[in-house]
Structure formats: structure tokens, C-alpha cells
From Swiss-Prot:
Keywords: Kinase, Nucleotide-binding, Serine/threonine-protein kinase, Transferase. PANTHER family: PYRUVATE, PHOSPHATE DIKINASE REGULATORY PROTEIN 1, CHLOROPLASTIC. Transmembrane segments: none annotated. This is Putative pyruvate, phosphate dikinase regulatory protein. GO terms for molecular function: ADP binding; ATP binding; phosphotransferase activity, phosphate group as acceptor; protein serine/threonine kinase activity. It holds the Pfam family Kinase-PPPase. Belongs to the pyruvate, phosphate/water dikinase regulatory protein family. PDRP subfamily. It comes from the Bacteria. Bifunctional serine/threonine kinase and phosphorylase involved in the regulation of the pyruvate, phosphate dikinase (PPDK) by catalyzing its phosphorylation/dephosphorylation. ADP binds at G153, I154, S155, R156, T157, S158, K159, T160.
Length: 279
């Protein structure tokens, strides 16, 4: 018998943007199929006054409290207040900081939002995001050779969201749609530096996605053909043949999240893999 779905409050307190905390909280919550977290996110909490207001909200809607607050005084207030309310509190970063301190033999500086300083890495990500927007959906200016990776695939194989995710990691990504009957831009075959990767999925999966999303700029397909599984299978065969012919690695995204697809591409980049394969 299937257990009924239950809901719980998940409070996330951060002295920075909260992105790290949110990722950790969602990763943990995903392990519980019959429970759904009602997320309460409190970013940029850096004063006791701000924190006290947050704690009032937690008292009104008790639940698990996760926090990334480097100020030890504020961290102590969180732990003490949560203990008084009878709710669990966990410092997500503290075990990691303790391990670093033990290994490096030096204490952490404990600066809020230290990972978000405007350094070279930050500007590299901004540059990659701008590059991605200029090279999305088949836009291939003459500077395509600057790309780290070019993603190809038929419609609805998550090319654009994967490109955005990679750009957020500082990777310059372009993407090109493969449409049956429409020639692939010649500039793609001339590219020497970028890793070119093909994304595919099952016809069933793509049909399901296409039925729930508009066609967009697909001039050679009407609505019926766009969602028809037989037609999609032909598109996929064309895409696979093209990738195999040119030695481009193929990644099946049918059961992959955007993050997992991006991780597979990052692994290919890291290994310098340019031979045709399927994963």
C-alpha cells in the first residue's frame, strides 16, 4: 500500500545567497519519496535583529532548520532558540569547516558570502553567460571557435537549459538544433577547438515534453509530426547518425536531470574526449 504524501516545513537560513543551503536541503529531501518540503528561505541574514524575526517565523511554523551562518554568535542563537522550540537545527558548513581547519592547521576567516567575491572566476561566469545567450538555438557567429562546448540535438533534448547550467560554471556553451531536412551549418564542421556533444532521449520522452510545450521556430514540422513518436524516432536516428559520422559523443538525457547532463559534459571536457560514444 502506498503511503500518503506528507508535508513538512524546511527552514533555510543563510548569511549569503542561500544557494548552497538550498541545494543541500533539496538533495536530502529528495531521498524521501512520500514527503514534500515546504521551503522557507532566508538569505542575507547577518544581524541578530534579522535573525530574531526569522526565528519568530520558525516558531509559528516549526520544522527542520538548516543554516549556513559563519558568525558563531548568530549560529549559537539559532541552535539555542531551536532547542527551546523543540525543532532540529543543523549547521551545514560547520563539519566541513572543522575538517578544513584540522587538515590545514588554520582556522577559517569566517567571512559571510566569501564565495561570492568579485574575482576572476565570477567574471568568467558572467562572460560565459553572455556567450551562451549570443550562441543559443543555432546562433553561430564567427567567434564560435571560442566555445568550450557545442551541444547539438533535436528539439526538446534540454540543449538550452544545459547550456545555461554550464555557463553558470564558467563554461562557454553554444547549442545548435538538429532538424530533419534542414542542413547543419557548415561552420559547425569547421570548428576545431570546441567539444561537440549530441543530446538524445527516447521518442516517448520527447513526445511527452513536446505535447506540453509549444513548437517554437521549427519551420519544417507541423503540430502532428512534432509530437508523433514515429517522426521523432526518425529525427533521433538522423541525430545519432550525424554524431556517429563525425565522432561526436552522445548523451542520452531520458533519465538525466539538467545537472547530471551537465556533469557528463564536464567529464568529457575534463578528459578531453572527442571520440564518438554513447552514455
Amino acid at each position: 500500500m502506498t503511503r500518503p504524501l506528507s508535508y513538512f516545513h524546511l527552514h533555510l537560513i543563510s548569511d549569503a545567497t542561500g544557494e548552497t543551503l538550498l541545494a543541500a536541503g533539496r538533495a536530502a529531501a529528495a531521498q524521501y519519496a512520500n514527503a514534500r518540503a515546504i521551503e522557507h528561505i532566508y538569505p542575507l541574514i547577518r544581524t541578530e535583529k534579522q535573525l530574531r524575526k526569522v526565528l519568530e517565523g520558525i516558531d509559528a511554523e516549526p520544522g527542520i532548520v538548516l543554516y549556513t551562518v559563519v558568525d558563531q554568535k548568530l549560529a549559537a542563537i539559532i541552535d539555542e532558540s531551536c532547542a527551546d522550540m523543540g525543532v532540529p537545527s543543523v549547521s551545514v558548513l560547520e563539519p566541513v569547516l572543522n575538517t578544513f581547519q584540522s587538515y590545514l592547521g588554520a582556522p577559517a576567516h569566517r567571512r559571510a558570502s566569501a564565495q561570492h567575491v568579485l574575482n576572476a572566476d565570477y567574471f568568467r561566469r558572467i562572460d560565459a553567460l553572455n556567450f551562451m545567450m549570443e550562441h543559443d538555438d543555432g546562433q553561430l557567429p564567427l567567434d564560435i571557435e571560442e566555445a568550450d562546448v557545442i551541444i547539438v540535438g533535436i528539439s526538446r533534448t534540454s540543449k538550452t537549459p544545459t547550456s545555461i547550467y554550464l555557463a553558470n560554471r564558467g563554461i562557454k556553451a553554444a547549442n545548435v538544433p538538429l532538424v530533419l531536412g534542414i542542413p547543419v551549418p557548415e561552420i559547425l564542421f569547421a570548428a576545431k577547438r570546441p567539444l561537440i556533444v549530441g543530446l538524445v532521449a527516447t521518442a516517448e520522452r520527447i513526445s511527452q515534453i513536446r505535447q506540453n510545450r509549444p513548437i517554437g521556430n521549427i519551420p519544417s514540422l507541423d503540430t502532428g509530426l512534432y509530437t508523433d513518436r514515429v517522426s521523432i524516432s526518425e529525427e533521433l536516428a538522423y541525430a545519432r547518425n550525424l554524431c556517429n559520422r563525425h565522432g561526436w559523443p552522445i548523451i542520452d538525457v531520458s533519465r538525466r536531470s539538467i545537472e547530471e547532463t551537465a556533469a557528463a559534459i564536464l567529464a568529457l571536457l575534463r578528459n578531453g574526449k572527442k571520440e564518438g560514444s554513447s552514455s
